[in-house]
């Protein structure tokens, strides 16, 4: 019988474990059933289930945070918000998947970190999962237009051929899943 050396295991998950956000007008809560629709969301859902089962079986304290889309400093440049800004400044097309009507919630990375710290440093939250969101759902195309409008106001020297950054929007084939 080995003594449990874990003080707490924290799993960071994604709201994609609940499935496509377009299917429901009701935001998921912690009791919402998982319905992953892509290999990525299925692996995150599987990880959540493994953490829960290991925690219960081996008495390992755990917490799970299920988070919406993060944005902020040092984000990978291929993610939506950085790609809008970087491509705009270079005068390159801004790819928008499908019709752009996919709804996403956005959470600043510092808010996400603060939420995780509140969860992991409070013993009453052990063996629970929490949804974390910015509570600001927006369609991808609307977010792209908002950022383009801000860039139109802030950027003094646009690429020569460009009058409005929104002209760079390029609807591309939606990704599978």
Where are these regions (language model features)?
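Aromatic/pi-system hotspot detector in well-structured domains
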Residues: 28, 76, 106
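N-terminal Rossmann-like NAD(P)+-binding domain of SDR-like oxidoreductases, especially those catalyzing
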Residues: 1-70, 90, 110, 119, ...
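Active-site loop immediately N-terminal to the catalytic Tyr-X3-Lys motif
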Residues: 35, 77-78
């Amino acid at each position: 019988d080995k003594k449990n050396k874990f003080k707490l295991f924290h799993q960071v998950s994604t709201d994609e474990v609940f499935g496509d956000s377009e299917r429901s007008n009701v935001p998921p809560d912690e009791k919402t059933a998982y319905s992953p629709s892509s290999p990525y969301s299925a692996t995150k859902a599987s990880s959540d289930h493994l953490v829960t089962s290991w925690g219960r079986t081996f008495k390992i304290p755990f917490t799970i945070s299920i988070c919406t889309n993060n944005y902020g400093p040092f984000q990978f440049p291929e993610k939506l918000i950085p790609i809008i800004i970087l491509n705009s400044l270079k005068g390159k097309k801004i790819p928008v998947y499908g019709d752009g009507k996919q709804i996403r919630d956005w959470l600043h990375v510092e808010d996400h970190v603060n939420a995780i710290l509140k969860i992991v440093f409070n013993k009453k939250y052990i063996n629970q999962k929490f949804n974390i969101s910015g509570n600001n759902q927006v369609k991808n195309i609307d977010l792209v237009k908002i950022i383009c409008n801000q860039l139109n106001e802030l950027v003094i020297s646009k690429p020569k051929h460009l009058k409005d950054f929104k002209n760079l929007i390029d609807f591309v084939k939606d990704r599978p899943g």
